[in-house]
């Protein structure tokens, strides 16, 4: 049975490493661990044609972010200026922190 765990969390800054949006940076808006997908701000924009459901909700063409596989993104390190691998350190008080493997800064 596969483990439902992602290497990125909501609010993380990530960079896309493959696909049509390769190289784009953005914040993770939503994570779906069971599907292994994330929604990244400004990445994988799709066009939806919505029908008006009521006078308060008009229809029209809407542009919104669609989920992408989490394997297509890497955590972004501000210090290195690129996508990086990360490690996990356990502090004396038991708190876990993620750190950049290139520059050893906390992410």
Swiss-Prot record:
Gene3D superfamilies: 2.30.30.30
Single annotated GO MF: structural constituent of ribosome
A Pfam match: ribosomal_L24
Coiled coil: none
The keyword Ribosomal protein appears for this protein: yes
Domain of life of the native organism: Bacteria
GO cellular component: ribonucleoprotein complex; ribosome
UniProt-listed GO biological process terms: translation
Transmembrane segments: none
Assigned keywords, A-Z: Ribonucleoprotein, Ribosomal protein, RNA-binding, rRNA-binding
Subunit organization: Part of the 50S ribosomal subunit.
Function comment: One of two assembly initiator proteins, it binds directly to the 5'-end of the 23S rRNA, where it nucleates assembly of the 50S subunit. One of the proteins that surrounds the polypeptide exit tunnel on the outside of the subunit.
Protein family membership: Belongs to the universal ribosomal protein uL24 family.
Cited PANTHER family: MITOCHONDRIAL RIBOSOMAL PROTEIN L24
UniProt protein name: Large ribosomal subunit protein uL24
Organism: Thermoanaerobacter pseudethanolicus (strain ATCC 33223 / 39E)
